[in-house]
Structure formats: structure tokens, C-alpha cells
Amino acid sequence: MRARMALKYAGVEVEHREIELRNKPQSMLLVSPKGTVPVLCLGDGLVLDQSLEIMYWALGQCDPDGWTLVDEVNAHDWVETNDGPFKTLLDQYKYPNRYPDLQQQEVLAKAIDLMLYPIEVSLQKS
């Protein structure tokens, strides 16, 4: 989702293909053997198969609002928190049957403490 959003924001035209993950096309596996999405095949033979890579590449093509002109360390920390511990908590909240020993309200509270409160503090400072 975030790779697609960055491409759209940057005005980069791409051929979008929906992939059924249970039935990955051979053409996709040839360019990206690990078989995960997203995959962006560039004309020069370069293949990007991480959403964050695709985001940075797209913003490198066109960044009309200067999103990349930020404190890189702070931005990286937010992405790492989102992709690591927050994603874990999100999965625990979304799929409670996979985590029967966890209480959803406790997971939600941890997620709020991890992401929402720090975002509010950051926004209040700006």
C-alpha cells in the first residue's frame, strides 16, 4: 500500500498487476525469486522488492512537497517502529485467534502507547 501511495504521489506511471499470492506468476518469480510483493521492475533491469525501497525511489523521482527534506534519523526511527513492534501489535490485535493468550485491550493499549501518544507529542511540538 505505501509503495503504491508513494508512486502515485510522485506521479510515477507504472503497470499495476494484482498478484494472487497463492498462485504467483512465473514472470514475477523470475524477477523476484523471493516471491513477495510489492515488486517494481525498472527499465534498466533494476528490481526493487521492498516497499520502503520503492517509496524512496519514487520520492527520488519527484517529491513535490519535500517529504524527504526531514530529519532522516527521526524518519527512519518512525519507520522502524511502524514496521517492527507496531506491526507485531497490529497483527496480534487483528488476528486474536492466532494469539489466544493475549488480551485484545492490552494489545491495543500497547499499540497506542507505542505509536499514537508519541505522534501526538511530536505534532504538538511542530
Model features per residue range: what roles?
Residues 1-117, 123-125:
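GST-like domain detector, emphasizing the conserved glutathione-binding G-site
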